[in-house]
């Protein structure tokens, strides 16, 4: 199966020109205004005290710029960024090897920090609190503990599931930042900036057309820009206008809401096969031809967020927005009361 253009997870195309598109300083970073304001204050305060920035947790959906913010923090603090992930650190020794390579004001960025092994976490606690690393050399009766001093560094954890962090780890993270989806206007600014870096001419209308299909996510916006740029170079004299963006994205099967073929197939299944629902998730997955976990983790969250489906105790139901989007008429007069539905009922 080909890679999905509108997934917020990282795919192969994202590595192309990825770092050239990322801002280096906090005043270049577009969006997340509340997060930027707080971080800017904390960074300046740490600099004035000549201390390391307190440890940070960035949480929210994927693709919103957590790694970019970590890189900006490292640049602002005059340190280097070292990147790893929770699943990649399998043993305490793996983490110890990383910690001993850090220098003063370096930033250690751990993606998916909620997936850290608990034994690995225990190594982190004294490193975060006291900047020391306790290691045991030898085995059995001959073993001994050695304490190594570490430079003043900043740990930045990123997670899509803040509730899965252990309490001891969460208590040691002094700066909590919630990342939110971007507005279409903010994404338009990001797209215009990225187009300039890529050497592609784009109109404001063309940028907005891509922005509104980018699902509130900069990673998707930049990905769609790269693909639309290909069409512009071949078919539209290297200029992305509103019309060029529309036609290109139609060929890429990304509609005006940012839905792709499977998103629309889910809505069609609920409306056409089950009269708008309710329908159980297992049955829905069967009709769509996707794995149940894929429906729940990949496709459903955005449809819920946009208000095109709701979860009820009896299953998924399509809303009036879904009917309108597909050009269908609701023959069932019953209305969905969203207040009686919950995003967390299965």
From Swiss-Prot:
GO terms for biological process: DNA recombination; DNA repair. Keywords: ATP-binding, Cytoplasm, DNA damage, DNA recombination, DNA repair, DNA-binding, Hydrolase, Nucleotide-binding. DNA binds at residues 311, 316. Mg(2+) binds at residue 67. Signal peptide: none annotated. Residues 183-253 are annotated as: Small ATPAse domain (RuvB-S). This is Holliday junction branch migration complex subunit RuvB. It comes from Clostridium perfringens (strain 13 / Type A).
